[in-house]
A protein has these predicted regions:
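Flexible, acidic/Gly-rich N-terminal and inter-domain linker regions that tether
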Residues: 1-46
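Canonical Radical SAM [4Fe-4S] cluster-binding loop centered on the CxxxCxxC motif
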Residues: 41-78
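Conserved alpha-helical substructure of the radical SAM core
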Residues: 67-96
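Conserved AdoMet/S-adenosylmethionine-binding subsite of the radical SAM
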Residues: 87-88, 92-96, 101-259
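Conserved small/polar residues in nucleotide/adenosyl-binding loops
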Residues: 268-275
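Hydrophobic alpha-helical segments, chiefly the membrane-spanning helices
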Residues: 279-281
Length: 281
């Protein structure tokens, strides 16, 4: 692998370990820019959350990554080097990859696609496509492009709101692609690929966590082959948003279950390979 790309592994600027086995790596790139990669350990294996850009232009109001404007795309080789550099430290088999780190993967589309092919090929890392997930905040045209790719990797949508009014407040991309367009793209993707889509929904206190919002979300996604992942908000000191209270998260979760939605929240259910709560940086 190394001889196909840059030979020198990244310098580890910072390495933090959490009690749950999660490890965060701050790497210095060849040009001096810094990126993060996150290692998660699960009962089904070890996964790496890969960064696709230096900075991010999506500007999601709740996200720490969006505070740093995008400087450039990462190449496929630079994404592979994140895996190699993490492996050099942990010396453990990497079983799953999630492209959900800093940056919008579909804003660096071709490099991300090249990366997915590299890690999946027999002479690469040989990670099965179904053990790879890519997350987007909703670049609708690229969802249609992704559906055409010769890939079996998973798609996750960062939705975080059940309607345009709330999504407009926290996700600028919604001004370009309304929630109705996004849901149609999700539906068309499912039909084209026969694959389930993960819906990521961060629960923010007083903003998108009401019972009304839960019912709106169920109405919005009714009949679609989706898996809703409720994510307790990871508070950012520079942001005004707060994590939903546990009892409110429970009510939101229970409302969706009563509406027969396929839903999980790691506060209440056992993690599976499709869970993405711990993948969010």
């Amino acid at each position: 692998m190394k001889q196909d790309f840059e030979i020198k592994l990244y310098e580890v600027v910072d390495h933090q370990k959490s009690a749950d086995g999660t490890e965060k790596f701050l790497f210095r790139l060849q040009d001096g820019n810094l990126i993060e990669s996150v290692l998660m350990r699960h009962n089904y294996g070890t996964s790496i959350c890969v960064t696709s850009e230096v900075g991010c232009n999506m500007g999601c109001a709740f996200c720490a990554s969006g505070m740093k404007k995008k400087l450039r795309n990462l190449s496929a080789g630079e994404m592979v080097l994140q895996l190699e550099s993490v492996y050099e430290v942990i010396k453990e088999k990497i079983s799953h990859i999630v492209v959900m780190g800093i940056g919008e993967p579909f804003d660096n589309y071709q490099n991300v696609i090249n990366f997915l092919h590299i890690v999946n090929e027999p002479h690469g890392l040989e990670i099965g496509s179904r053990h790879i997930s890519v997350s987007t905040c909703g670049l609708v045209p690229m969802i249609y492009e992704y559906a055409k790719e010769d890939l079996q990797s998973n798609l996750a949508i960062s939705l975080h709101a059940p309607n345009n009014e709330i999504r407009d407040q926290i996700m600028p991309i919604n001004k370009a692609y309304r929630i109705e367009e996004l849901v149609k793209a999700i539906s068309d993707y499912i039909i084209a690929t026969n694959r389930r889509v993960t819906i990521e929904y961060i629960l923010i206190d007083g903003l998108n966590d009401s019972i009304k919002c839960a019912n709106e979300l169920a109405d919005l996604l009714h009949g679609l082959n989706v898996y809703i992942n409720l994510i307790p908000y990871n508070e950012v000191k520079e942001k005004p948003f707060k994590r939903s209270k546990k009892e409110q998260m429970r009510k939101f979760y229970d409302t969706l279950k009563k509406r027969s939605m396929n839903v999980t929240c790691l506060l209440y259910t056992s993690p599976s390979p499709r869970d993405t709560e711990r993948y969010r940086m």
